[in-house]
Amino acid sequence: DMGCEILWENGFLSVKSTDLKAVEFSGENCPDILPVLSLGLCFGKGRGKITNCQRLRIKECDRLTGTARLIKSLGGNINCDESSIYTSYTESLTRGDLTVYGDHRMRMLAAMCSTVAKGKISIDNTECVAKSYPNFWADFKSLGGKINGC
């Protein structure tokens, strides 16, 4: 339990928290959302760990290493080994120009990073997210994400 309040009302899901806690869990059955979950875990107080992440290595890119490198390049406290991700509390992310390995999920992670960064994040090849989520950028913008050039 990371300390989030999750509400489902009128067809909308909302998640809010004022004091996230770091947790440990297995990523074995949810590889496609682990990059974004890793970002959230960075903002939990304490040390976080996601185990059983080895499937991330055989996606469009090595998402295990890519996730850690991307978040770390923006100032996040995150590392990985052969099969796990480790985080510790990160107050905020900084700006950056990101090259994200030709992988649609890594671009979506970069977009999520932009929502908590203190400054602009530039992402290359934004069109590739259409592979799994054609309306991603429209939905991102409708939820308050700022977009230039999409």
Protein language model features and the residues they cover:
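Short, structured segments at the rim of ligand-binding sites
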Residues: 1-150
